[in-house]
Amino acid sequence: MPGPMTLTGRYVTLAPLGAADVPALDAANRVSDAIWDYLPYGPFPDRAAYAAWVASVANRPDPRFYTLTPAGAEGPMGVASLMRVFPEHGTIEVGHICLAPALQRTRAASEMIYLFADWVFTAGYRRFERKSGAPNPPSPRGGQRVRLALPR
């Protein structure tokens, strides 16, 4: 099972989600309510509601949430999780990807997938999954950008 860990790449650092991340994430996420369109939560009416959501998910083992902080940024600009963890089947999925508009379609966002995939396979899992749905057009394009193409 993935635990609290920090993964650092050239363009982004992934770290466990916690209460200290709320101000930066809330500010980054207020730019566009559209980032919540395909998630089962959000947008949040105020920082207190966002903080309550973070408190409710921050220490869960599955899904395990991480922040994404681009190199040079003052704070995190997105979250993602490792979820649907089945060690007995050797599978794990990345999901709950919520990126501020400034982080979307960047090297940092692409590297997030690489860092998670590298950890997953190094930890001995055999399958790394990423949900992608037709109702969310940016999702398949994001998968193609990191060579996680849809099956034909």
Question: Where in this protein do the model-derived segments appear?
Answer:
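Short, conserved glycine- and acidic-residue-centered signature motifs
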Residues: 109
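Conserved beta-strand-loop-alpha-helix junction that forms the acyl-donor binding cleft
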Residues: 130-140
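Conserved GNAT acetyl-CoA-binding A-motif
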Residues: 122-132
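GNAT-family acyltransferases
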Residues: 1-106, 119-123
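Alpha-helical, largely C-terminal catalytic domains
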Residues: 116
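Conserved catalytic-core motifs of GNAT/GCN5-like acyltransferases
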Residues: 131, 149-152
